[in-house]
Each structure stands twice: as C-alpha cells, then as structure tokens.
Amino acid sequence: MSVAPTRGNLIALKQQLRLAIQGYDLLERKRTVIMRELVGLIEEAKKLQEELLSTFEEAYRSLQKANLDLGIESVEEYASGIPEFKAMKIIFSSVMGVEVPEIQIERFETEIPYEIYSTNAALDQAYLVFRKALELVARVAVIENKVYRLAHEAKKTKKRVNALENLIIPHLKETIKYIQDTLEELEREELFRLKRLKEKVAR
C-alpha cells in the first residue's frame, strides 16, 4: 500500500469512502430515472411512428387523387403557394441534469391557404394530412434526439457506477482495512513492549 498507516489517513479514507458510497447511490438513482424515462420515450416514439406511417399513407392517397383530378402541374402550382409552416418552436428542459429538447407547436391551423373553390376535396385533405404528418415528423425527431442524449448519459453514468462499485469503493475498503490492521498490530507491539518494560523495572 502506498498510503502511510496513520490515524489521520484512516479518518480521511473513511470520509472518502462515505462520499464514494453517497456518489454511487446518487448515480444509481440517476441511472434508474433516466432508464425509466427512456422506456417511456421509446414507447411513445413507436406509437408516433405508427401514426406517422398511416398519416403519410392517407396523405399520399389524397395527393394521388388530387393529381388525377386536377393534374400534377396544377397541384404543384397550389403547393408552391403554400406558406412555410413556422408554428413549431424547440425549447430545452432538464432530465436529471441532461439537457433535452422539447417541441412547442402552436394551435393547429385548419384553414386552407388557397382558394377552395378552385380545388377539390382530395387536395384539401392532402394538405391537412401532410400538415399533420409534418407535426408528427417533428415530434418523432425531438423524441429520437431525447433518446440519444439520455442513452448517452445513461452509458456514461453506468461507467461511473461500475468504477465506483468495482474499483474505487473496494480499493478504499481494502486500504482502510490495511491501515486498521497495521495500527492494531502496532498497538499490540507497543503494549507488548510496555509489558516487557514493566517486567524489567519490577525485577
């Protein structure tokens, strides 16, 4: 052992051990919360992806019908006049100290941004469903980003937990035991020396 077997070092190491155990408990709780959050996010992403797939299928069916009814060029002309959708905003929140994105979507506007009398129901439906799909794509992207960030943090936390559990805490315990054993041995030797000294004085 490289640590001198003194009572001062013993006290310091016991304090380090207490802090290491506290750190281990905190990190383990953090990892548990993150893993619980991940399970919920993965389940949410799965449901959204299923909804997104069915929404795209519905949108493309409506678009195909509009293309047949109005012609591809007319549909493209209407599409080029649709304003950019800017009703989404990304903000950040914290999950156990990990910064994760959240999406804010303003009230979904159902108003058609072109003259309805010049189109047909299929094109109107395609527009509305593609708007819904855009919102779902944004939600899925945000959730996937959250999953990536939290999974990365969970991996880092697991490494720290393993280091504390398998290396740092056992090493501290071993060093403490070594110092305690050494101090006890020195104490026994000192008692034996004093006993011998008393015996010599008594003769």
UniProtKB/Swiss-Prot annotation:
UniProt keyword terms in alphabetical order: ATP synthesis, Hydrogen ion transport, Ion transport, Transport
An annotated Gene Ontology molecular function: proton-transporting ATPase activity, rotational mechanism
Domain of life per record: Bacteria
Transport in keyword set: yes
Biological process terms in GO annotation: proton motive force-driven plasma membrane ATP synthesis
Keyword Ion transport: yes
Entry similarity comment: Belongs to the V-ATPase D subunit family.
Free-text function comment from the UniProt entry: Produces ATP from ADP in the presence of a proton gradient across the membrane.
Protein name, entry field: V-type ATP synthase subunit D
